[in-house]
Amino acid sequence: GGNYPVGGSRSIAESIAPVIHETGGKIIVNAQVDEIIIHRNRAVGVKLTNGEELRSSLVISSAGITTTFSKLVKQSSPPALNMDKVNPSCAHLCLYIGLKGTAEKLGLEGTNLWIYPDYDHDANVERFIADTSTNLAVVYISFPSTKDPDWEENHGDTATMEAITLAPYDMFSKWEGTDWKKRGEDYENLKNELTNRIMRSVYAHVPQVEGHIDHLELSTPLTTRDFLGYSQGEIYGIEHSPERFRQKWLRPQTSIKNLYLTGQDIVTDGVAGALMSGVVTTSAILRKNVIKDVLRRTS
């Protein structure tokens, strides 16, 4: 995007954590939620996969619409929602590239690159989904370390890049019953093939990094599924199409009392959309226009 947090994306969480602690909150990690506990159509807490129950007066889900109502809400009569009106967003591959040498030594700039085979972007996507052996529909190349003014102080003589492209979930569906790092040789061979295809675009547009690669790691839609809980490995939750924005039920309030929604499915996709959804959900809970307060404090 147009802004980059000093210290990288982790700085966002690290800046929020003290506020949560100071107001009496608690952050729990490595605690996977199995179920939102519903009693008489009222959310009263969550149940973890280890069986532990955490009771609360409110439950706010940022797990996404699909995950929330297809996996976490397990009551016999789930809310009547027009789920057929929303679709998952596209799945993706992300190649994480570690480099020997600083951005300055390698001549890297912070400008993002968007690489397309031609100007008909819709046709590019349709062609690739129909035949994944054709040209990649798009390759987006980003330079996180170049954008971070604290990078060299914290990480020395290194630099990073990311290269992202679309990838239909069906490419990997044969391995959906497997676990991370235990998917087998065929899966690893496919990852290597895709890594090489992406790197051809990288070398074509950032040729000076050739010979300076220290690490390559490719995430697939299955990686996204396993770490973020999106069943189709979608990159941005639900598809943010015109039809999605016609759905009036996509809002913080739900038909289950004390169960609220937040995250990019409620506002729009990306980091900024997810952050603003927190403000919108807070406004709904407090019944107060918190957005005005935020704008007043930042103006």
Where would I find each of the regions flagged by the language model?
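Helical element adjacent to the flavin cofactor pocket in flavoenzyme catalytic cores
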Residues: G1-N50
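Flexible, glycine/charged-enriched surface loops at secondary-structure junctions
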Residues: K26, N30, Q208-E217, K292-R296
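Active-site-proximal substrate-binding core of FAD-dependent oxidoreductases
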Residues: Q32, I38, R287-S299
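Mid-domain catalytic core of redox enzymes
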Residues: D34-H155
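Hydrophobic, well-ordered secondary-structure elements that form the walls
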Residues: I60, I97, A163, V202, ...
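C-terminal segments that line or cap access tunnels to active or ligand-binding sites in enzymes
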Residues: T102-S219
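A glycine-rich dinucleotide-binding beta-alpha-beta segment and adjacent secondary-structure elements
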Residues: L136-Y140, M199-R200, A204-T268
